[in-house]
Amino acid sequence: MTKFIFVTGGVVSSLGKGITAASLAAVLEARGVNVTMTKMDPYINVDPGTMSPFQHGEVFVTEDGAETDLDLGYYERFLRHSKMSKSNNFTSGRIYQNVLNKERRGEYLGGTVQVIPHITDEIKSKILASGEGYDVAIIEIGGTVGDIESLPFMEAVRQMQVELGRNRAMLMHLTLVPYIASAGETKTKPTQHSVKELRSIGLQPDILICRSDHHISQDNRRKIALFTNVEERAVIMCEDAQSIYQIPRTLHEQDLDDLICERFGLDLPEADLSDWDKVVEAQLNPESTVTVAMVGKYVELPDAYKSINEALLHAGITHKADVKIDYIDAERLEDDDSLLAQLHNADAILVPGGFGERGTMGKIKAITYARENNVPYLGICLGMQLAVIEYARNVLHIDANSSEFDRKTAEPIIGLITEWLDERGELQIRSDDSDLGGTMRLGAQQAELVAGSKLAQIYGANNITERHRHRYEMNNRYIEPLEQAGMTVSGYSAKQHLVESVELADHPWFVAVQFHPEFTSSPRGGHPLFNSFVKAAKNYSEAK
């Protein structure tokens, strides 16, 4: 039967619950545990798909097309054998929607629908379903203890601990142990009060993860244990690390996995973390440095491009290179030519995905620079669409545009997906008036690469599967004139024959793809497309 580890956070947000939980999952997996992870978000949005990247950061897309919290990206990157799906992330909005739909269908037989038991029962059912078929399920609760939005989730966890018993449920709580410079010491009082807040709603943590930017003394560890009713060995010190991939080793060296196995009655071999040691060694000891200029409109919040940032890091690890990302505001680049110096200093240029017209001319300016100056270029999603528009305008000399930016354009080289097949194979009509959450091409889909193309050489295969998140596609009637002018279509979707990628044969490295390869990159091996891109950047840097 599945065993559950619930993860909460206290004192402040952004302590790294997702990374810590994923690191623990990686250690358990290294011991042979079949482990999965789930994120519960207290906000009322049904999913993060239509939320602003400035507020929420990246939307991570799963294989089955769910638009989820960026923490699920961490989960997949730390785990080898468990892929996330729509059952691994749910919000208060989704829970309330499900309960209200049941009420409308009469499933509650006219009873009064309340937070307890109806909302909490729905939360519990989601948690149990997400853990089916696994040895251990790690459940992260978003937000901070004390937030009013989190209370139904906390109550559901309390009930599950009672119902499952000590041998099937544990609570791990992350807290901050701040360092007070004027006093020259770390303070335990915030942690004590955070646990007090938990206990006031009926929850007693079994494990405390104490985050700090300074060393926490053994005396303070004993003090925390004494005043929180947690075993001293279960008070785990987790100081700031040079690399997040050091965290599995940090947790293992403090015997956290042994404690969990003992509590759950699991007799397992020792964890083999040698892969993580190799990752950390390569990351912290690079042999070269390359700079990638990332031109986007959400650059004020790097988390908006979290998976791309990580994919570049992974490629750097693969090539023992320190990949520095120089973020360039696409909107500023439109009118500020002084930013061209950043493009000039870059060893490669990347234009990521995005929505809307704002900043597109700045991105096109960057693409033109990469094409004309033989700088390695990688376009992702919108980065591919704009590469096609740029080439059509400046090489074919036609006034091409996307119908996303100009509904009345005479040359719609990029157009809306107006018809689509759902998972049952039924035709779904989509238009500009449809709900934003229902007009997307989402999830893992197969693509067929043209034999002999650069992309086929990069992947070492002619058939690939990558994840999508977009509404607009390249218009196939422009394929022939583009190819006659030198831009090659190197990949098509397997079923709909939609354009998946383009490249330039007369350019050292110019590849643009409609899909999102960053979602499947791993620190242990990277991703072939990003690996090739960073290698091209290294070659460009060395040839300067």
UniProtKB/Swiss-Prot annotation:
Annotated binding of ATP, by residue: S14, L15, G16, K17, G18, I19, D71
Enzyme nomenclature, EC number: 6.3.4.2
One Pfam family in the UniProt entry: CTP_synth_N
Active site per database record: C381 (nucleophile), H516, E518
GO function term, MF aspect, one: ATP binding
Binding site for UTP: S13, K187, T188, K189, P190, T191, Q192, K223
Residues noted as binding CTP in the record, renumbered to the chain: S13, D147, I148, E149, K187, T188, K189, P190, T191, Q192, K223
Region (Amidoligase domain): 1-266
Binding site for Mg(2+): D71, E140
Record field: catalytic activity: UTP + L-glutamine + ATP + H2O = CTP + L-glutamate + ADP + phosphate + 2 H(+); L-glutamine + H2O = L-glutamate + NH4(+); UTP + NH4(+) + ATP = CTP + ADP + phosphate + 2 H(+)
Reported regulation of activity: Allosterically activated by GTP, when glutamine is the substrate; GTP has no effect on the reaction when ammonia is the substrate. The allosteric effector GTP functions by stabilizing the protein conformation that binds the tetrahedral intermediate(s) formed during glutamine hydrolysis. Inhibited by the product CTP, via allosteric rather than competitive inhibition.
Family assignment from sequence similarity: Belongs to the CTP synthase family.
UniProt function note: Catalyzes the ATP-dependent amination of UTP to CTP with either L-glutamine or ammonia as the source of nitrogen. Regulates intracellular CTP levels through interactions with the four ribonucleotide triphosphates.
UniProt-recorded name of the protein: CTP synthase
Organism field: Psychrobacter cryohalolentis (strain ATCC BAA-1226 / DSM 17306 / VKM B-2378 / K5)
Gene: pyrG
